[in-house]
């Protein structure tokens, strides 16, 4: 590359903004990758904490259930103790002996001791319940494995305490059983002392009682005899039913055999008809074989004719393919001839275009030299004008470098054009063939025009980038002036203390602050290039804040779920009351898809409907003699269970009004 005296030498410049931008982008990508990694690790830790929290809550619920059961047992023992104490007082009043009084006093003392022990156990259970609730709340806020281990140890300690208290409760139950036995003995002694001498009235009552027992015994024998008769009748009915089932089975087998016989008869008729048709075809064939040829000979000749036809079809296909190939070759030759003619015309026109292009390039060269002079003169004028200001040396050097590069490329292009023209002249002198000379000149003109187009496109690109840079600089300066001239005014707006929008803005502001601090520390750690595998404290604080937000959200969800459960229970009770008041049945939904219906007129009677097996169970048949008839009519025949229930309600209402 040739250089003039005015062109400046190459100067080392700092890294370009594009390189720094790429470096910053790589750093940002690295930080984003590390941020995503931290997010995934935090999510995994949160899921582990949720699983541990669910396990602790399950253990807490189990512990609370055991505590409730122990408390219920304690209350039951307390009630039994009170009842035994009352019975002991009654036995003390009834028994006149000193031994009975001493036993009653001892029993009363043991009852008081058991009551005191029961109260102590109840207080211990309440304390354990409070400690278990505190442990459950502490377990819900635990964030590490050590806290979970401590809570599990505490739960094991509570379980051991509960087992110990259950053992004590069982011992108290045994003692209560012993006291009940003693009270029963005292009652028996009191009864013996009160009934040692029987009067005449008692003897008469005993006789009446004996006669009543004899009558009941006779009645039971009659009922037993009637039961035996019914059993024999039932056995005879079962034998008849079995014989009827056997006859029905034999009848179905005979019917199946009869149907098979009909099918075989139909098949025999079809075969006979087919035989007749085949005999007719055979007679027709005998008419056509007058020359004595058999069907095998005819089939052989037909197969030979098919093979010959296939061979002829294959030959015709090959000939058709050869003909198509000849047509394609003829078309290709005609196309090549037309292309050669067009190429000849293009070669002739390219000579004229080269002459015009050479003249235009000379003109552009002169114009580019003049443009370079004008640009350098403008740069000098700008440098004289900007002497009082602080110039941007980097932009000036860049513009000056662009001008020098443009000038050098123009000179290189001119020299290359001269060399190409000299080579063209030498080839034209050495080679007398006009076709080869025309081809070489076409190649040189094509290369020259391609290089010129590339330089023009590059020049336009540089001009466009320069204009964009100037426009961006002017916009940034305008924004800077507006920001400097902006006077902020503080506006106070009256808001609620627990405003959801303000709370959301506070959460977002805190998250933004934590993320900025985390980004700054990560950038500092990345710039320092520390080899330690550690994360800054801001990352941990930000993750802790996210966990706190999730816990708040979980608390609100649990609160909402509890409210919905309460509402569901209340609405269920309202539904049951509405059904009871409208239909007259109190519904009780049991496990296994069963529904227990209690009528309002007979609360000691019920109907149990099993919706899975479609069965109905009731004890109303004892008060309704027409129960079986109604069941067969409305349920078995009409399949109308609502009508059956309405009929039951009408009958119960009539019976209650008549009573």
Swiss-Prot record:
Residues 23-531 form a coiled coil. The keyword Cell division applies. One of its GO terms (biological process) is mitotic DNA integrity checkpoint signaling. Residues 1-24 are annotated as: Disordered. It is found in: Nucleus. Pfam families: MAD. InterPro entries: Mad1 (IPR008672). Residues 1-10 have a biased composition (Polar residues). GO terms for cellular component: kinetochore; mitotic spindle; nuclear envelope. Keywords: Cell cycle, Cell division, Coiled coil, Mitosis, Nucleus. Central component of the spindle assembly checkpoint. Belongs to the MAD1 family. This is Spindle assembly checkpoint component MAD1. It comes from Eremothecium gossypii (strain ATCC 10895 / CBS 109.51 / FGSC 9923 / NRRL Y-1056) (Yeast).
